[in-house]
Amino acid sequence: MKLLEPGTEIDGFSVLECIHSGGMAHIYRVEYAVGAPNPGFPLAMKIPRMTAGDGAENIVSFEVELQILPTLTGPHVPRFVAAGDLERLPYLVMEYCSGHTLQHWLDADERPDVATIARLGAAMGRAAHSLHQQNVCHLDLKPGNVLFTHDNHAVLLDFGLSCHAHYPDLLAEELRRAVGSPAWIAPEQVVGVRGDPRSDIFAIGVMLYELATGELPFGAPSTQGGLRQRLWMAPVPPRQYRPDLPEWLQETILRCLEPEAAKRHPSAAHLAFDLAHPDQVPITERGQRQHGLGLRTQFKRWIKAVG
């Protein structure tokens, strides 16, 4: 579908401008047409790409978001407004949230200080916990999908790869393969396990690692073999890149990135608490680590992962 021109009207909504044109959807600022009631907040319309060359994932992801977004409430998600008919013109209208995505801090010339990293991480943890309390796992948390408002709330965006505990998992049923963004996908997602809230904790850990070091802990692999390495490989300790980082922060980040979900924080609320109360973080070998794990330990992890 070609981009909509400003002034185009769709089901009582008037297009103002295109604010994002991505591989899976176009997003527009819109407003109610003349004579319609004012909702009291700005609006955005998301229209999935559905040209002949686009895969089934685009439309399935739209169906997933259409299924999940209307069920969500609270300050950490955009408010749902309306949806278009799937057969005629599929679209979602939701609250437009202003602020900066996490990418804003990653694009800065200097790495943020420890207090900023902890503040951003705690906000992400609280937002993820709110989502998990509503029986939803995001499963595609990454810098472009986390927005920070001017009052320092984290707002989670794009629920096209999400999973609701009480609804059919359309992506698992239709695609039957791991789906997610390669740099941030959790090890269990790589092997097809969806619906574990601790997968979102892993993704937050990847973002904290990149905030702290400017590096991705597992790179951005493009092959299944590259993705599977995170099932056993340990990332370079953040303090090796940045010695000024405190042990408690490295401890917290590396705990998020444990290949076994059971070894991560038990909930996103626990992660948020640790980031807000560094004096209460118990320091283990993870926090004191100066170098990557030895070959023997890596081999044991590999045996456990493949066995």
Residue ranges and their predicted role:
Residues K46-R49:
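Conserved beta3-strand ATP-binding lysine motif
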Residues A52-T71:
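AlphaC helix of the eukaryotic protein kinase fold
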Residues A83:
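Activation-segment/catalytic-loop signature of the eukaryotic protein kinase fold
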Residues E87-T101, W105:
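Conserved short submotifs of the Hanks-type protein kinase catalytic core
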Residues L120-G121:
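Activation segment signature within eukaryotic-like protein kinase domains
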Residues R126-V136:
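Protein kinase catalytic-loop region centered on the HRD/HxD motif
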Residues A183-I283:
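C-terminal lobe helix-coil module of Hanks-type protein kinase domains
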